[in-house]
């Protein structure tokens, strides 16, 4: 397990960044999850679940199934568990994507929100995700930091851990190499207006934030080969 990543995301958990990530990404996450076709009896894995907000959204769809969230940060997982006590169809585990502690062909759907670019060995992680999926199952990932969304490139120098800046074509190729088919890429827009008095540490200016919003989040999905 990547100790540098675990340490950093444990710090994020203590700083409340799991909850701020929900505030920032939930409008896009809701749209992405709605497009996945999760059924009431689906078996779903949320990779890089953080504080578990997307896991709980998925659990609302798979209310007669099961949703498992994993994260490399034990402190994020603890917060996810504490926030999900009302959900009987949810569980969480501390694990990294490159070595998933699950059986082959276990899940009908896999979701990942804002985590792919942190993986040290993304090809291995994608192959592991493919391994644990049932044939014909859907994997959908959302990322904001990608080559075509230039405004997000400024994040790279502010992060304490290395990240992978990839293009849409890069992601498509990696999905294909991992065994996925029927690859789709689409943009999802956050419908909230940008405040006139926007100030934040995420972007250097309001103009940068507007450009980021206009470019949209990248959702890339693929089906596990039958």
Describe every region a protein language model picked out.
Residues 111:
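A conserved beta-strand element that flanks and buttresses the S-adenosyl-L-methionine
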Residues 197-226:
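Core SAM-dependent methyltransferase catalytic element
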Residues 123-135:
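A short glycine-rich, Lys/Arg-flanked "PGG" loop and its adjoining helix->strand segment in the class I
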């Amino acid at each position: 397990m990547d100790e540098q990543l675990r340490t950093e995301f444990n710090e994020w958990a203590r700083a409340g960044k799991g909850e701020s990530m929900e505030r920032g990404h939930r409008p896009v996450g809701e749209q992405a999850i709605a497009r996945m076709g999760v059924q009431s009896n689906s078996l779903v894995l949320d990779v890089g679940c953080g504080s578990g907000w997307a896991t709980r959204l998925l659990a609302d769809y798979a209310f007669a199934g099961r949703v498992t969230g994993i994260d490399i940060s034990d402190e994020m997982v603890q917060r996810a568990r504490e926030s999900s006590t009302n959900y009987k169809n949810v569980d969480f585990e501390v694990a990294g994507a490159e070595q998933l502690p699950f059986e082959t062909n276990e899940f009908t759907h896999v979701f990942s929100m804002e985590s792919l670019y942190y993986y040290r060995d993304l090809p291995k992680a994608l192959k592991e995700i493919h391994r644990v999926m049932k044939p014909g199952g859907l994997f959908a990932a959302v990322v904001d930091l990608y080559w075509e969304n230039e405004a997000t490139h400024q994040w790279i120098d502010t992060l304490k851990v290395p990240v992978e800046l990839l293009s849409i074509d890069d992601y498509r190729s990696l999905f294909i190499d991992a065994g996925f088919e029927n690859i789709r890429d689409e943009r999802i827009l956050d419908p909230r207006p940008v405040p006139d008095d926007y100030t934040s540490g995420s972007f250097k200016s309001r103009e940068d934030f507007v450009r980021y919003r206009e470019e949209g989040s990248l959702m890339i999905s693929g089906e596990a080969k039958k």
